[in-house]
């Protein structure tokens, strides 16, 4: 978009934070609480619940309308929030603690993490953030049909999730923006606190590059929605908290070729099944199971809007119509795989492009975990299960179907994969700065050396808190 005027707008603060999601809101909260002046730059707008319309939610709340795809053999759909509050607005608010084993893997990759950010310090930051965000265990009354199926499928190995919510009613519309405004998303919690402490939020303000002079970051160049250019200057530091993909891309746009271990994402598969339970599937809150950890997988009972659940039903004509008549009985589970594959973010015509492909072992574990989940869903009380394979049985309802499912080859693009968890694998120094650039802090999961195997919301806010508190101590 061409600017309406050649004038460059200018403003300044002690700290400039790029991004208002989990990391940006946590960083802004602690920076502002210290008495520093803070400006938060957010590309999107303040969110409003989209109601029941899935297309409207995708257009208003998601980057690229939820249609971005990683370049590579697996065609993984990349789901990222693009609004004030970032992906926290359209997530389920699940706060899974960072496993110590994942932190130990970071230390194996980079021994400096042992002293750079000890696990105890990170876990204390998590406890602090859990208290601030009113993180509570999901009550049984809100666990819905998908959760009940999971508890019956994996007795003793399915647990309520810990969530940051306020009086959740189990509306089942988390992915569209909670219609009851019960989600403790960043815009309603940490960012609201930051504003009370004096932070300013500039929405509709897309960061284009970091301004660097003599090896020091001194601000951000951004484009406003009306086309005008803005220079937002930082007296002390710039915090990149735009998400692992966007933060990695901003470094490239700023003339920095970052080093690291390579980008990772956690592939997500959705498994749908027809429940025979009296509890309906249109409402509820997530439940999680660790039963699939031998495959490097986490299993979550999720609640999706009706239209989204309908998209997972197989068949055409009368067969599909019959299944749609039972849409209230369709329960969904999410499987998240911790991968070994690495990729990279590139700049493509002024936009980020993720290049990523799973390893053969990753694909095989995806299929093994999917088969185990299908078997579990049938055991839990589903009459038929829909595994979503491109070449494989569309419906699984018997032992024979399970055998055919296990025999499916682990080829690229066999599974319709999505990703909502991203990890940049980029190097930082002991002040969490980009090496060689003073005052440019990586405050989000772009700095995580590897995937962590669980949803990263809690780990991201804890990391941003620990990093920020080091800067204002």
Set out the residue ranges of the language-model regions.
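N-terminal Rossmann-like FAD-binding beta1-loop-alpha1 element of flavoenzymes
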Residues: 15-40
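Glycine-rich loop(s) and the adjacent beta-strand/alpha-helix scaffold that form part
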Residues: 30-33, 37, 44-49, 83, ...
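N-terminal FAD cofactor-binding segment of flavoenzymes
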Residues: 36, 43-101, 145-150
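Helical element adjacent to the flavin cofactor pocket in flavoenzyme catalytic cores
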Residues: 172-236
């Amino acid at each position: 978009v061409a600017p309406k005027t050649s004038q460059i707008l200018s403003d300044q603060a002690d700290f400039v934070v790029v991004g208002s999601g989990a990391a940006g809101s946590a960083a802004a909260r602690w920076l502002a609480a210290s008495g520093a002046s803070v400006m938060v730059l957010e590309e999107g707008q303040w969110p409003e619940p989209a109601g029941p319309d899935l297309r409207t939610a995708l257009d208003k709340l998601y980057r690229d309308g939820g249609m971005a795809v990683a370049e590579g053999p697996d065609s993984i759909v990349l789901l990222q929030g693009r609004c004030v509050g970032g992906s926290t607005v359209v997530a389920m608010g699940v706060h899974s603690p960072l496993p110590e084993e994942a932190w130990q893997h970071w230390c194996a990759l980079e021994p400096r993490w042992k002293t750079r950010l000890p696990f105890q310090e990170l876990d204390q930051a998590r406890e602090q953030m859990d208290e601030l965000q009113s993180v509570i265990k999901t009550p049984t009354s809100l666990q819905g049909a998908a959760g009940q199926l999971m508890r019956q499928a994996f007795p003793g190995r399915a647990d309520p999730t810990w969530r940051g919510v306020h009086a959740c009613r189990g509306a089942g519309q988390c992915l569209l923006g909670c219609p009851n405004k019960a989600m403790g998303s960043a815009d309603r919690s940490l960012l609201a606190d930051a504003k009370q402490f004096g932070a300013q939020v500039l929405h509709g303000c897309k960061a284009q590059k970091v301004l660097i002079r003599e090896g020091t970051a001194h601000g951000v160049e951004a484009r406003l929605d009306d086309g005008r250019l803005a220079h937002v200057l930082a007296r002390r530091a710039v915090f990149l908290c735009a998400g692992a993909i966007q933060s990695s891309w901003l470094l490239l746009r700023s003339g920095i070729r970052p080093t690291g271990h390579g980008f990772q994402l956690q592939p997500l598969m959705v498994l749908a099944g027809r429940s025979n339970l009296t509890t309906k599937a249109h409402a509820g809150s997530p439940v999680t199971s660790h039963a699939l950890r031998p495959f490097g997988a986490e299993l979550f009972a999720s609640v999706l809007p009706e239209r989204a659940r309908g998209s997972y039903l197989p068949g055409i004509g009368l067969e599909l119509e019959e299944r749609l008549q039972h849409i209230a009985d369709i329960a969904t589970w999410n499987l998240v795989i911790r991968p070994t594959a690495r990729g990279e973010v590139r700049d493509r015509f002024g936009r980020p492009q993720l290049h990523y492909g799973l390893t053969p072992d990753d694909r095989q574990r995806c299929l093994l975990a999917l088969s185990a989940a299908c078997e579990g869903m049938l055991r839990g009380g589903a009459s038929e299960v829909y595994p979503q394979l491109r070449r494989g049985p569309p419906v699984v309802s018997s032992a024979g179907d399970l055998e055919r499912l296990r025999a499916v080859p682990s080829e690229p693009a066999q599974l319709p994969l999505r990703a909502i968890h991203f990890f940049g694998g980029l190097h930082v120094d002991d002040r969490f700065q980009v090496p060689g650039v003073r005052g440019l802090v990586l405050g989000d999961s772009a700095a995580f050396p590897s995937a962590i195997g669980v949803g990263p919301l809690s780990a991201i806010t804890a990391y941003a808190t620990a990093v920020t508190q080091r800067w204002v101590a």
